[in-house]
């Protein structure tokens, strides 16, 4: 039995028990064997980290909302306590993101074989820098945003040339890059453009979509379409607000009135 077999089994066991810290620990040990990861193994690693960071991101959203409410109430002691708690969760997020990025850079990218695994790892790297950008500020936010974009662009170059438009990894990459542009770069126009291009290209190739990828690919396509609808609606609302303000300002300032 290969050394990785016991570790992979433990990772699967930990996943079933929803003990994601132990799942990640087991899969990190597999990565450090320097043998590269199989498709199943890299998915296990991704699922473990996704659940770990997902819980922290959800906590951050809740804490951020509470912090705003306390600021509105003007309760300084509560604001201070909430801010301290937020910083605690930020530190935990920082560690998770830095750990996975280190594993990717040190063990996974150097041992990736083929376009699929390369795109997977660079996409994952972009994702975790994006999660850092969600709470970093100032120059730190700029730095991690640039690192996220660099990783996404590296993944995208390979995906465009070596993966089909309906490949779930390529579609997932397009989905996450578009989210990056909307939420981190505050560029919904660019986000919509990327999401629409990915969706349209995939639709054109649907007849050749393999049965193996059908479920995953169509699910991501639906997410792309949902995001497009949401972002276009938000931009339309913003445009209406701007027109209303312009009309009001114009009427007040028009010398011919």
From Swiss-Prot:
It comes from the Eukaryota. Gene3D superfamilies: 14-3-3 domain (1.20.190.20). It holds the Pfam family 14-3-3. GO terms for cellular component: cytoplasm. InterPro entries: 14-3-3, 14-3-3_dom_sf, 14-3-3_domain. Belongs to the 14-3-3 family. Is associated with a DNA binding complex that binds to the G box, a well-characterized cis-acting DNA regulatory element found in plant genes. This is 14-3-3-like protein GF14-G. The gene is GF14G.
């Amino acid at each position: 039995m290969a050394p990785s077999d016991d570790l992979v089994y433990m990772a699967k066991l930990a996943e079933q028990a929803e003990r994601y810290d132990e799942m990640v620990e087991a899969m990190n040990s597999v990565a450090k064997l320097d043998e590269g990861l199989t498709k199943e193994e890299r998915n296990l690693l991704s699922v473990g980290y996704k659940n770990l960071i997902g819980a922290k991101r959800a906590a951050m959203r809740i804490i951020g909302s509470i912090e705003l409410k306390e600021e509105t109430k003007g309760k300084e002691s509560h604001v201070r306590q909430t801010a301290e708690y937020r910083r605690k969760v930020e530190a935990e997020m920082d560690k998770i993101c830095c750990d996975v990025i280190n594993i990717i850079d040190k063990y996974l990218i150097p041992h990736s074989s083929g376009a699929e695994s390369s795109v997977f790892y660079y996409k994952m790297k972009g994702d975790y820098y994006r999660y850092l950008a969600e709470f970093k500020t100032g120059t730190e936010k700029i730095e991690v945003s640039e690192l996220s974009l660099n990783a996404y662009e590296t993944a995208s170059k390979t995906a465009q040339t070596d993966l089909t438009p309906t490949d779930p990894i390529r579609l997932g990459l397009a989905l996450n890059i578009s989210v990056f542009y909307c939420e981190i770069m505050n560029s919904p126009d660019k986000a919509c453009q990327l999401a629409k291009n990915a969706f349209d290209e995939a639709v054109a190739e649907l007849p050749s979509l393999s049965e193996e990828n059908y479920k995953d690919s169509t699910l991501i396509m639906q997410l792309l379409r949902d995001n497009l609808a949401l972002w276009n609606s938000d931009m339309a609302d913003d445009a209406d607000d701007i027109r209303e303000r312009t009309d009001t300002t114009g009427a007040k300032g028009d010398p011919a009135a």
